[in-house]
């Protein structure tokens, strides 16, 4: 199983930027923790970070046929990007949206996600641990899909 982790604008500044909101852990440290959990679950991870909307859209499109699922923190683009929303919908892969802070306790404009309706799930407010929760969730979803396909294949074979 292969999962793409996509980090949006300013996520590369974790540990420096607004530590009171996002905590002191750097993006690279989050990725290292995810790699450890992934290795324990026989999962391969790829990581991508960009501050540019078009690059994020390109990366989502590249996921089609190459990964089993996506974990995305679209950061500020969560609230503004129809293009990212449409890319997620187009590839139709299991996708989990992650936010380190609880966006529902913050400014009103942060409380509306354009991408949530096309994601399998959303995890907010658990700090960096939210990425671990997202990883466990995407593994579960991908396993369910794999098992469903195997059952369908077996039914077709038995006809």
Curated annotation (Swiss-Prot):
The active site is at residues 22, 99. It is an enzyme of class 4 (lyase). Pathway: Metabolic intermediate biosynthesis; chorismate biosynthesis; chorismate from D-erythrose 4-phosphate and phosphoenolpyruvate: step 3/7. Gene3D superfamilies: Dehydroquinase, class II. Its EC number is 4.2.1.10. It catalyses: 3-dehydroquinate = 3-dehydroshikimate + H2O. Disulfide bonds: none annotated. InterPro entries: DHquinase_II, DHquinase_II_CS, DHquinase_II_sf. One of its GO terms (molecular function) is 3-dehydroquinate dehydratase activity. One of its GO terms (biological process) is quinate catabolic process. Substrate binds at residues 73, 79, 86, 100-101, 110. HAMAP family: AroQ. Catalyzes a trans-dehydration via an enolate intermediate. Belongs to the type-II 3-dehydroquinase family. PANTHER family: CATABOLIC 3-DEHYDROQUINASE. This is 3-dehydroquinate dehydratase. It comes from Campylobacter jejuni subsp. jejuni serotype O:2 (strain ATCC 700819 / NCTC 11168). The gene is aroQ.
């Amino acid at each position: 199983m292969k999962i793409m982790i996509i980090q949006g604008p300013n996520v590369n500044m974790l540990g420096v930027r607004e530590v009171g909101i996002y905590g002191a852990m750097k993006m690279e440290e989050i990725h290292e923790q995810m790699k450890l959990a992934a290795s324990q679950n026989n999962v391969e991870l790829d990581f991508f970070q960009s501050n540019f909307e078009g690059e994020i859209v390109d990366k989502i499109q590249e996921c089609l046929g190459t990964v089993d699922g996506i974990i995305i923190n679209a950061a500020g683009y969560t609230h503004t990007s129809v293009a990212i929303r449409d890319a997620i919908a187009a590839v139709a892969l299991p996708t989990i949206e992650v936010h380190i802070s609880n966006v529902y306790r913050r400014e009103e404009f942060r409380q509306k996600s354009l991408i949530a309706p096309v994601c399998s799930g959303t995890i907010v407010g658990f700090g960096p641990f939210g990425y671990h929760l997202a990883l466990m969730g995407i593994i579960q979803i991908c396993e369910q899909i794999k098992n469903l396909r195997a059952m369908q294949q077996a039914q077709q074979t038995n006809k």
